[in-house]
From Swiss-Prot:
Organism whose genome encodes this protein: Salmonella typhimurium (strain LT2 / SGSC1412 / ATCC 700720)
Name of the protein described by the UniProt record: Penicillin-binding protein activator LpoB
GO cellular component, one term: periplasmic side of cell outer membrane
Chain positions covered by the region annotation Disordered: 28-73
Alphabetically ordered keywords of this record: Cell outer membrane, Cell shape, Lipoprotein, Membrane, Palmitate, Peptidoglycan synthesis, Signal
Amino acid sequence: MTKMHRYAAIAALAIFLSGCMAQRQPAPVEEVKPAPEQPAQPPQPPVVPSVPTIPQQPGPIEHEDQTGQPAPKVRHYDWNGAMQPLVSKMLQADGVTAGSVLLVDSVNNRTNGSLNANEATETLRNALANNGKFTLVSVQQLSMAKQQLGLSPQDSLGTRSKAIGIARNVGAQYVLYSSASGNVNAPALQMQLMLVQTGEIIWSGKGAVQQQ
């Protein structure tokens, strides 16, 4: 009987347990929802480093048009009017031997401005042409003598010593040294006749030069 009771108790327990399991509700299953998709981010362009600003370089210097400016004043002088009286006095000077060779140096500009010394020299040579007392050293001879000193034919010898030195080279007995000095608007013309052998000034004269 005891075994029967034991079997009965076990069977009852088994029935009870199966009933409890039948009454238990299954656990709710949560539906897994997929996460919302994030919109794709557009690719960012690469960052270009900023270039420092280069300061603007100054442009070329533009000079104003000089064509509209007036040309410098050209002075014209009455060289012949100033030289003729002086040449006449020189030809009458004492101690001058007729037929001698005379070297006429270029007129030296010693004024405070610019003047056409070549024009003055040409006028002086013309005033001495056919003078009847001197034979002039030719322009060609004088040019060759100046070139030997490294000077151009238009250059004045500048000093009396150079003029005397060249006069000896060309066989002249006299040198006529002339210069224009003072104010360029009213220069003074000075002439000196020198003896080549001694360098002595045997005559000198001075006159005013007027503008034309």
